[in-house]
Amino acid sequence: MPVRRYGGRYNNSSPGVSNALSPSTTAGRPLSPSPAAGSKLASTHHDPVPQEAYYVNDEADARHQQQAPFREPSVEVEVEMIDDEPPHGSQKPLSVAPYTANASNSSGRSKRNAITASGYTFYTNERQKTVYEALRSLRPLAELQEPRRVKEYAETSLKDSLYRIIEAHDVIMVAGAFFGDEGKGKTVDAVAHHPLCTCIARVNSGENAGHTVYDKAGRKFVFNLAPSGLLLPGKRNYIGPECVMDPVSFMEKEVIQLIDAGIDYRDRLFIGNVCIVTPYHKLLDLLGSAANSSTLKGMAPVHGSKVMKRGIRLDHIFNDDETLRKRLEKDMDTYLGLLKVKNLSDADVVRLCREENSDGVVRVPDYVIAFAQAKVKVEFLVKLYRDRVRHNPDFPARCDVTYELHAAVLRGEKVLLEGPQSYWLSNARTKFWESTTSADTTAAGLLAASQLNFQKFKSVVLNVHKAPGSSRVGIGACPSSFVPQDYFSAQNIKTLRDLPSETCANFEAVQRTLFRDGFPHSNDKARHNGIMAPVEYSDETGKYNIGVAMAIASAQHHGECGAVTKKPRVCGFFDCVLQHEVNSIQGPYLTISALDRGDEYDKVGVTIAYVYYNPEGKQVDVNGHVYKNGDIIRAGDPVPSEPALYHCHPIVKLIDGWRDNPIAAAKRRRNAPLPRGVCELLSTIEYFTNCKILSIGNGPNGDDIIYLRQ
């Protein structure tokens, strides 16, 4: 059995996972009755809501219904935990009104302090307190004291750092290392500026990715499928054949920006034989997806058509109408069948579309609604594509992208593959399979989609993460998040504008409460166990669980919302458990964006391990390993899949901030020594993930990057 480098002890029956619970920890402290495993309240490390609330059914828990009594662990390791799980359970809810910013209930209490329609609460409930009290006596992990030595990091130049890596490779991939939205654009821009980097390509996924770029004049462009290098003269940008594209949306939302700005893209942008996202794919997404589970860009349905070989590609639009018509008729059967099964009329679909757009954010475009209204839908699509694509003089040039990229590398040029989404959002990662996108957005997926010869051409991956405020948008498990992933959407909070502006608006006070009260023993190494207490934050609008307060305050203060959907992202701690797997699979290089945010924090938290805990004592079998209460999952251990991760809670190492020595580009002198807090944070991340940190972001501008000497 291999030994981990920091000497973790193992459960004899399950290599790599130790157990932190002993019978004495829960003896005499019975947990209160609970709903079916998986229900969760809206708070940091989210215990199921109290009995008087109601619960939302979730299919994930059906896979592990066997009740398991608490058993004495074979190995005891010292740590503390509280429960963290998304809304699961089998109980159906009573009728409880959803949260409304300025409403009061019959008792006069603000509904922000009531149990919401999802079963979530804004305050800390009694069950949370009970569970925390039952577990608080567990002792700290020794790893909380690592690393023993803090490295000193010296700044170096772009040419002596990133450019040396570029020059040693043929294919450079910039890939997200968490759940998307990591700030990859800045690294993409830095690579694209290298003189030998002539080709920038998007090779898979679709318009569900989004990024904001600026040209030299400071003009803002929001691209979804278009590569970021479009604004750089002399660069060729490609959209490869494994991408999926709604060509109407692409013209109306992306190409129009170039036209309006007077940018000639004729020799800069080339499109391969992409799979086409049709209006019915987007409607299938709307009709078949749970709230907050999709960008409504038709990704899962179009990838289904692609795999079934039923859809259309771009070449079909540019050839005879009869073939196009036949393929559309066949592929549309899925949409028409769903309407029949759900007993929906065209008018019902139109109504749902308009409801989705009712807050002013256009999630369902007009032409998609027009398709839903059309009597002869196939003819509507044939005419739509004929007018908006085939006969559109502004539609970009088409080419064999695979051939062009291959030829460029043979000429000695460098190819940049711009990764959409991220490693953990890849459909090829089984750990989060149910809540991922539909393409393989790992670095391996990028290289495969590019069809570049991986034995002939040297490739390298630049992984990108973000801290503080690592974030995820959409549903799914994320143990290091401040609240459940569906916390906002469950209360019909679709955009940042839907958050009451006065709620948890004082970020300074919220983060101070988190680190002072949420980790009451943070300055006592013998007692700090890395588990966040379910304390409350109060302002003039009410009381909030500290996780809720941090989630709201972080989203507002950092402007954390999806570039495509505008959904508030759920922030949390930098997660070394997940990051370790990313670097072990995709290579050691890591760049951390937005680190200047740390200038405003008293402390910065880093998740170094998880602890599995389910209040009902239920166990989860993942890949033949049975996770039970008290099991510790360290960085470097196998990462379990979501049924277990829903019950995993972060063990957080705290690092002192650097308020007195800010690193923001506007405040820092170039080549000034980095503050000790920054060095300790970077040392901690490198220690637990085996990564090599190439650079850190310290401002909003493209060149606000501090490159680190290796």
From Swiss-Prot:
<feature type="binding site" description="in other chain">
    <location>
        <begin position="181"/>
        <end position="184"/>
    </location>
    <ligand>
        <name>IMP</name>
    </ligand>
</feature>
<keyword id="KW-0479">Metal-binding</keyword>
<feature type="binding site">
    <location>
        <begin position="563"/>
        <end position="569"/>
    </location>
    <ligand>
        <name>substrate</name>
    </ligand>
</feature>
<dbReference type="GO" id="GO:0005525">
    <property type="term" value="F:GTP binding"/>
</dbReference>
<feature type="region of interest" description="Disordered">
    <location>
        <begin position="84"/>
        <end position="110"/>
    </location>
</feature>
<feature type="binding site">
    <location>
        <position position="569"/>
    </location>
    <ligand>
        <name>GTP</name>
    </ligand>
</feature>
<dbReference type="InterPro" id="IPR027417">
    <property type="entry name" value="P-loop_NTPase"/>
</dbReference>
<comment type="function">
    <text>Plays an important role in the salvage pathway for purine nucleotide biosynthesis. Catalyzes the first committed step in the biosynthesis of AMP from IMP.</text>
</comment>
<comment type="similarity">
    <text>Belongs to the adenylosuccinate synthetase family.</text>
</comment>
<dbReference type="GO" id="GO:0046040">
    <property type="term" value="P:IMP metabolic process"/>
</dbReference>
<keyword id="KW-0963">Cytoplasm</keyword>
<keyword id="KW-0436">Ligase</keyword>
<feature type="binding site" description="in other chain">
    <location>
        <position position="295"/>
    </location>
    <ligand>
        <name>IMP</name>
    </ligand>
</feature>
<dbReference type="InterPro" id="IPR018220">
    <property type="entry name" value="Adenylosuccin_syn_GTP-bd"/>
</dbReference>
<feature type="binding site" description="in other chain">
    <location>
        <position position="421"/>
    </location>
    <ligand>
        <name>IMP</name>
    </ligand>
</feature>
<comment type="subunit">
    <text>Homodimer.</text>
</comment>
<keyword id="KW-0547">Nucleotide-binding</keyword>
<feature type="region of interest" description="Disordered">
    <location>
        <begin position="1"/>
        <end position="53"/>
    </location>
</feature>
<feature type="compositionally biased region" description="Polar residues">
    <location>
        <begin position="10"/>
        <end position="27"/>
    </location>
</feature>
<feature type="binding site">
    <location>
        <begin position="210"/>
        <end position="212"/>
    </location>
    <ligand>
        <name>GTP</name>
    </ligand>
</feature>
<dbReference type="GO" id="GO:0004019">
    <property type="term" value="F:adenylosuccinate synthase activity"/>
</dbReference>
<feature type="binding site">
    <location>
        <position position="181"/>
    </location>
    <ligand>
        <name>Mg(2+)</name>
    </ligand>
</feature>
<dbReference type="GO" id="GO:0005737">
    <property type="term" value="C:cytoplasm"/>
</dbReference>
<dbReference type="GO" id="GO:0044208">
    <property type="term" value="P:'de novo' AMP biosynthetic process"/>
</dbReference>
<feature type="compositionally biased region" description="Polar residues">
    <location>
        <begin position="101"/>
        <end position="110"/>
    </location>
</feature>
<feature type="active site" description="Proton donor">
    <location>
        <position position="211"/>
    </location>
</feature>
<feature type="binding site">
    <location>
        <position position="309"/>
    </location>
    <ligand>
        <name>IMP</name>
    </ligand>
</feature>
<dbReference type="InterPro" id="IPR042110">
    <property type="entry name" value="Adenylosuccinate_synth_dom2"/>
</dbReference>
<dbReference type="InterPro" id="IPR042109">
    <property type="entry name" value="Adenylosuccinate_synth_dom1"/>
</dbReference>
<feature type="binding site" description="in other chain">
    <location>
        <position position="437"/>
    </location>
    <ligand>
        <name>IMP</name>
    </ligand>
</feature>
<keyword id="KW-0658">Purine biosynthesis</keyword>
<dbReference type="InterPro" id="IPR001114">
    <property type="entry name" value="Adenylosuccinate_synthetase"/>
</dbReference>
<dbReference type="InterPro" id="IPR042111">
    <property type="entry name" value="Adenylosuccinate_synth_dom3"/>
</dbReference>
<feature type="active site" description="Proton acceptor">
    <location>
        <position position="181"/>
    </location>
</feature>
<dbReference type="GO" id="GO:0000287">
    <property type="term" value="F:magnesium ion binding"/>
</dbReference>
<feature type="binding site">
    <location>
        <begin position="180"/>
        <end position="186"/>
    </location>
    <ligand>
        <name>GTP</name>
    </ligand>
</feature>
<feature type="binding site">
    <location>
        <begin position="697"/>
        <end position="699"/>
    </location>
    <ligand>
        <name>GTP</name>
    </ligand>
</feature>
<keyword id="KW-0460">Magnesium</keyword>
<feature type="binding site" description="in other chain">
    <location>
        <begin position="208"/>
        <end position="211"/>
    </location>
    <ligand>
        <name>IMP</name>
    </ligand>
</feature>
<feature type="binding site" description="in other chain">
    <location>
        <position position="567"/>
    </location>
    <ligand>
        <name>IMP</name>
    </ligand>
</feature>
<dbReference type="Pfam" id="PF00709">
    <property type="entry name" value="Adenylsucc_synt"/>
</dbReference>
<protein>
    <recommendedName>
        <fullName>Adenylosuccinate synthetase</fullName>
        <ecNumber>6.3.4.4</ecNumber>
    </recommendedName>
</protein>
